[in-house]
UniProtKB/Swiss-Prot annotation:
Name of the protein this chain belongs to: CAAX prenyl protease 2
Membrane protein topology class: Multi-pass membrane protein
CC annotations in GO: endoplasmic reticulum membrane
Places the protein is found: Endoplasmic reticulum membrane
Function noted in UniProt: Protease involved in the processing of a variety of prenylated proteins containing the C-terminal CAAX motif, where C is a cysteine modified with an isoprenoid lipid, A is an aliphatic amino acid and X is any C-terminal amino acid. Proteolytically removes the C-terminal three residues of farnesylated and geranylated proteins, leaving the prenylated cysteine as the new C-terminus. Is able to process K-Ras, N-Ras, H-Ras, RAP1B and G-gamma-1.
Endoplasmic reticulum as UniProt keyword: yes
Keyword annotations: Endoplasmic reticulum, Hydrolase, Membrane, Protease, Transmembrane, Transmembrane helix
Family: Belongs to the peptidase U48 family.
Length: 302
C-alpha cells in the first residue's frame, strides 16, 4: 500500500501534468478578466434607476434582462483572452463546460452528492410535512408562476454559474493549477455578493447589522463557490454546478431553530443524519467527482 506522502506526491504530479497541458496566459490577464466580469455582473444589477426593492417584479425583470446581457458578453472574454493554441485544439463550447460526453453523470451524481450533504435538513423538512407539497401540481404551477421563485431557482443559478464558473474558470485555469483555481474564482463570487450591504442600508438597516450580515453572506457564498468551482473543474460540465446551486438555493441554510423545536427522538435522528450526511459527503466527494466518470481530460485529468 502507498503511504500518505507517496499519494500526495502522485496527486501533485498529476495536477502539474494537467496544469502544464493547458497553454498558459499571464496571471494579470486572467485575474483582470475575472475582475471585469464580476464588476459587469454586479453593475448590471444597478444600471436601472428604481425606487423599488430587489423583490419588486419590475426590479426582478430588469435584472433578468441585465444579467442576460452579461451572459452573452462573458464568453467573449474567454474567446479573446484564452491562449490561441488552446482554442485551436479544443472546441470552444467544451471550454465553457458545454458538452455531451458525461452529461448525464454530471446531472445526476453531483446533485445526488449534494442531497446527501443536506440529509439532516431534508429529514427536518419531512417532519414539517413540507415535502408533500412537492407532489402537488398546484405547488409547481405556483412556483413557476412566481417571479421570485424563478429568480432564485433558475435565473440566479444559471447566470451566476455561467459567468463565475463557465467563463471565469477556463481563464483562471490557464494561469493556475486546478486546486489553486478552485480557491481563486470563489473569491470573486463572494465579493460579488457584498452589494447586498448597500441594498440593506437603503432599506434602513443599521450599518453594523448590514456589515455583519454581509460578512456572513460573503463567507457562505465563498464556501459554496469552492464547491461549485471544484465540481466544474472535476466534471468539466457547467450543468453540475448550476443544478447544485439551484438545489442549495432551494434548501437555504440549515434552520437550527426548527431542528431544536422537534421532539427529542426526531431531534436525535436529525442530528445523526446531519453528521452522517456531512461525513458521507466528505468521503464521497473525491470518488463521485473522479474526472474519468465524466470523460473530463481537459481541466483535471483522471
Amino acid at each position: 500500500m502507498k503511504n500518505l506522502s507517496e499519494t500526495e506526491a502522485e496527486v501533485t504530479m498529476q495536477e502539474n501534468v494537467v496544469h502544464e497541458s493547458l497553454p498558459q496566459i499571464p496571471v494579470a490577464t486572467s485575474v483582470s478578466c475575472c475582475f471585469v466580469l464580476a464588476v459587469l455582473y454586479v453593475g448590471s444589477l444597478y444600471i436601472w434607476s428604481t425606487k423599488h426593492n430587489r423583490d419588486h417584479p419590475t426590479t426582478v425583470k430588469r435584472r433578468f434582462a441585465s444579467v442576460s446581457m452579461v451572459m452573452l458578453a462573458a464568453p467573449f472574454f474567454v474567446y479573446f483572452f484564452s491562449s490561441p493554441e488552446l482554442l485551436s485544439r479544443v472546441p470552444f463550447p467544451k471550454l465553457l463546460g458545454l458538452r455531451l460526453e458525461g452529461l448525464w453523470q454530471a446531472v445526476v451524481i453531483p446533485y445526488s452528492l449534494t442531497v446527501l450533504l443536506f440529509l439532516g435538513p431534508i429529514f427536518v423538512n419531512m417532519q414539517n410535512e413540507s415535502v408533500r407539497s412537492y407532489f402537488d401540481l398546484d405547488y409547481w404551477r405556483g412556483s413557476f408562476g412566481s417571479i421570485i421563485w424563478v429568480r432564485n431557482h433558475v435565473i440566479a443559478p444559471l447566470s451566476e454559474e455561467f459567468v463565475f464558473r463557465a467563463c471565469m474558470m477556463p481563464l483562471i485555469l490557464q494561469s493556475f493549477s486546478p486546486l489553486v483555481a478552485v480557491f481563486i474564482t470563489p473569491l470573486f463570487f463572494g465579493v460579488a455578493h457584498l452589494h447586498h450591504i448597500a441594498e440593506r442600508l437603503s432599506l434602513g438597516v443599521e450599518l453594523s447589522t448590514a456589515l455583519l450580515i454581509g460578512l456572513f453572506q460573503f463567507i457562505y457564498t465563498t464556501l459554496f463557490g469552492f464547491y461549485s468551482a471544484f465540481l466544474f473543474a472535476r466534471t468539466g460540465h457547467v450543468m453540475a454546478p448550476i443544478l447544485v446551486h439551484a438545489f442549495c438555493n432551494h434548501m437555504g441554510l440549515p434552520d437550527l431553530q426548527d431542528l431544536w423545536q422537534q421532539d427529542l427522538w426526531r431531534r436525535v435522528v436529525a442530528i445523526i443524519l446531519y453528521l452522517a450526511g456531512f461525513v458521507g459527503w466528505m468521503f464521497l466527494v473525491p470518488l463521485a467527482t473522479d474526472p474519468s466518470i465524466y470523460d473530463n481530460t481537459l481541466y483535471w485529468n483522471a
